[in-house]
Amino acid sequence: VITVECKFNSKVKELLKSVDINIKELERYTNFILNEYKGTRKFWFYELTIKMIECDTSGYYFGENHIELGNKTLKRNIEQKRKWYLSSYFHELCHFAQDNLDKVKESKLNYTDKDASECNNNYYKNPYEVQAREWEEKYTEAYISIYY
């Protein structure tokens, strides 16, 4: 059984509330996803810190169990913003799973910040980034269909 306690800072709580995302529902859904992804009889407990940053990107820090969600988006309405923040969260949650459940070393994500900002093939075709984009699409759509 995998249990993740999500520790949202006050700014990210405010951000998610502004687009009608219930953080308790999001935490329960997070635990559901991770237990479906990696079935185990062991008890694994993690604390995952999620904070808001003033930018248009998000990030996960391998080895630190820390997600940063950017608050800047060009999306105009609440539904588009909600989808944007959720997809960013699920993308970074995939990196959390890669780090903690799959034991992927950060060095396997062998691209630079420049590669990521340019979205070139080093970044875009990296198998761990491909998987994270798949999580974005799959879990964002499922979450929205369940809760909205």
PLM feature spans:
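Post-HEXXH active-site segment of zinc metalloproteases
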Residues: 83, 87, 99-130
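Histidine-centered divalent metal-coordination motifs
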Residues: 91, 95
